Amino acid sequence: ALAYEGNTDLIDDKLNTTRSIDDIFKSAQRVFNTWSKWNPADRTTENLLRMLDFDFFEVLDSVTIARSRKHIQKYYDTAEIGTFPTRLKPISLRPPLTNLKQAINYNEIFELLMLLSLTIYTPSHFILPSKMDKYAELYEDNKVNIGFTQANREQGIRRLTAINLMKRMESSVYSFNLTLKRILELIESTIHSIDTYDKKSSVKLELTDISNVDEFDSEDQNDEELFAFGKKVKIEIGDMDYKSWRDSLVKDRDVLELLILMVGDITPEYDSKLQELFRVIKNKLEHPINEGNKKIIIFTAFADTAGYLYDNVSKFVKDKFHLNTAMVSGSVEGRTTVPKLHSDLNTVLTCFSPISKDKYLLMPDDKTEIDLLIATDCISEGQNLQDCDYLINYDIHWNPVRIIQRFGRIDRIGSKNTYIQLVNFWADVTLDDYIDL
């Protein structure tokens, strides 16, 4: 279906045609109906093309036509263009957080996270009533982003941070721990600012915007509008009920310190999810689903997790199987275990999927090959990586469309693989608990 929402003016204005798109399609349909009644000798593609007018071809040149897997299988000669690989039943894995005895689990972490107020992200809630008009004038009447008051923006950041914490917990202990430490550092520096003001009341201090946008991975952040306003907001501590704010910050600090302490013992050797990933990789390499194919893609939503996986997985596959690994991310520089190989996106993907990327043309003298690719969603769209037959979602993206897009990197017509496999890692919680998360 064409995405012009029933309003043909939306697309007519963008097309270089003499008639509306509705008229063009009606005319094309009449031509087709006439052509389809001709005898077989005259009912040729050449005759049909001659009957269609210029406007119809202008439309075809101006739009992208999406075809589903079923549509292609039904209407196209797959013997000529190739077939789709057979999708094996997806594998779902739910490893525990750790195999350490009496260690914290997902549900216990969730309960502690529910204790966080995250008021570090809502300083405007503590502005004294007598000072509210001052900040309403400064920020809420700002015309740059009508509808986003500073208080609303802060509340949005607080909620996003809470969701971000939970998704990072699900992604990896390492990523979760990093985020806890970053928020703790922010809280401690703010408490220090308050204490400094409290002890030296003659010193005029201002709090600039404390939201840390970098905490969200750029390839995942779809809430740019939320962060576009208020970057230079300043609230004088003297205009706040800073004692109440400090009390709230201290409570969050104590919870964060407890969480950091409890997850700190979960090092890679005790990270059950990572160890399960090693098992999955080992099984795939020792028992390939397509003869001789060792290639694996591991997707994660977070650059921190991608780096953690690269540090551990690359060593594992190099030591055990003498294979090369690479990592690509939209927010950090790529990495690879291949000596002297440029780790830019195009080079890495060409070495990972040499057939689909025509490596023999681009790098004819290079025999380098990468068998394991760790990636964020910077490559979840638009990349043909059909040399690979095995895709692992190390975490589940909040947007289900991304999961489909990820698998689409290897589920492609003309694939040399007979079978393809999807593996999903889920948090070790019940369905009801997961919905709550």
Regions found by a protein language model. Give the residues of each.
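SF2 helicase motor core recognition
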Residues: 360-367, 374-388, 408-413
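A conserved SF2-helicase RecA2
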Residues: 401-407, 411-437
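Inter-lobe coupling linker of SF2 helicases/translocases
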Residues: 2-210, 436-437
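Conserved helicase motor "Helicase C" RecA-like lobe of SF1/SF2 P-loop NTPases
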Residues: 303-329
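Conserved interdomain hinge at the start of the Helicase C-terminal
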Residues: 268-301
